[in-house]
């Protein structure tokens, strides 16, 4: 009760062992965040459409004034083309091709033997990588859980060797240089984005 690590929420387990998150959000802030993404097409560094996904897939239990239901209906719209383009453009730059891009940061961290930094940068690389894939498929981002299986099962556009490269990445982390795997992943995602 009263957890505020990420958002103000109560986390409970019901008698039938179902876990439930009860989240308390300022509706105006929530709408402004979603509007910035969906209407203004402002990309994030990974997870761009998570809150939009959260809104349109939420099971509304209590909505005394109907505002959440109205907001949900307002944003049940087709995926904006400009948003798709902006997410892909922004996150591709983060993957590779710039001095601070993740591929360079990962390589530097590996070279200095900084495993904590490797772990952190790979997580950020994957956040941008999956953001691109969901945007390419015009799917709202479902959040951090089961991303690989959701992509494998539901995405029509995937990089070649999608599962193979992810499995290689995780199998090789902290045991060998993963820069080659990261490079292969970048090549394949650039191939399908044609950028």
PLM region spans:
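Conserved nucleotidyltransferase catalytic core and NTase-mimicking acidic/glycine-rich helix/loop elements
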Residues: 67-195
């Amino acid at each position: 009760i009263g957890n505020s690590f990420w958002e103000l929420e109560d986390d409970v387990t019901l008698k039938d062992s179902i876990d439930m998150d009860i989240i308390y959000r300022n509706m105006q802030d929530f709408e402004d965040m979603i509007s910035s993404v969906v209407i203004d097409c402002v990309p994030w560094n990974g997870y761009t459409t998570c809150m939009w996904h959260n809104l349109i897939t939420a099971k509304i239990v209590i909505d005394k004034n109907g505002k959440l239901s109205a907001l949900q209906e307002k944003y049940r719209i087709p995926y904006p083309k400009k948003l798709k383009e902006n997410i892909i453009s922004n996150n591709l730059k983060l993957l590779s091709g710039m001095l601070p891009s993740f591929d360079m940061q990962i390589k530097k961290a590996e070279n200095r033997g900084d495993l904590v930094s490797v772990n952190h940068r790979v997580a950020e690389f994957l956040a941008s990588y999956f953001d691109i894939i969901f945007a390419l498929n015009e799917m709202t981002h479902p959040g951090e859980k089961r991303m690989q299986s959701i992509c494998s099962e539901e995405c029509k556009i995937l990089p070649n060797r999608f599962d193979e490269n992810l499995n290689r990445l995780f199998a090789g982390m902290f045991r060998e240089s993963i820069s080659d795997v990261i490079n292969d992943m970048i090549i394949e995602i650039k191939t399908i984005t044609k950028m």
